[in-house]
Amino acid sequence: MRDKWRKKRVRRLKRKRRKMRARSK
């Protein structure tokens, strides 16, 4: 159960990082 939650959180963090990178461009 904990692993599933961690994966979900990581996915959300990755998405936020992608948006930030696009803004830097």
Swiss-Prot record:
Oligomer status and interactors: Component of the large ribosomal subunit (LSU). Mature yeast ribosomes consist of a small (40S) and a large (60S) subunit. The 40S small subunit contains 1 molecule of ribosomal RNA (18S rRNA) and at least 33 different proteins. The large 60S subunit contains 3 rRNA molecules (25S, 5.8S and 5S rRNA) and at least 46 different proteins.
Function: Component of the ribosome, a large ribonucleoprotein complex responsible for the synthesis of proteins in the cell. The small ribosomal subunit (SSU) binds messenger RNAs (mRNAs) and translates the encoded message by selecting cognate aminoacyl-transfer RNA (tRNA) molecules. The large subunit (LSU) contains the ribosomal catalytic site termed the peptidyl transferase center (PTC), which catalyzes the formation of peptide bonds, thereby polymerizing the amino acids delivered by tRNAs into a polypeptide chain.
Protein family membership: Belongs to the eukaryotic ribosomal protein eS32 family.
InterPro entries the UniProt entry points to: Ribosomal_eS32
Domain of life: Eukaryota
GO molecular function, a single term: structural constituent of ribosome
Protein's UniProt keywords contain Cytoplasm: yes
Region: Disordered, residue numbers: 1-25
Intracellular or extracellular location(s): Cytoplasm; Nucleus
Chief subcellular location: cytoplasm
Pfam families: Ribosomal_L41
Name by which UniProt lists this protein: Small ribosomal subunit protein eS32A
GO biological process, one term: cytoplasmic translation
GO CC annotations, alphabetized: cytosol; cytosolic large ribosomal subunit; nucleus
Any further remark recorded for this protein: There are 2 genes for this protein in S.pombe. Initially thought to be part of the large ribosomal subunit. Crystal structures show eS32/eL41 to be a small ribosomal subunit forming a bridge at the interface of the 2 subunits.
Keywords: Cytoplasm, Nucleus, Ribonucleoprotein, Ribosomal protein
ATP-binding listed as a keyword: no
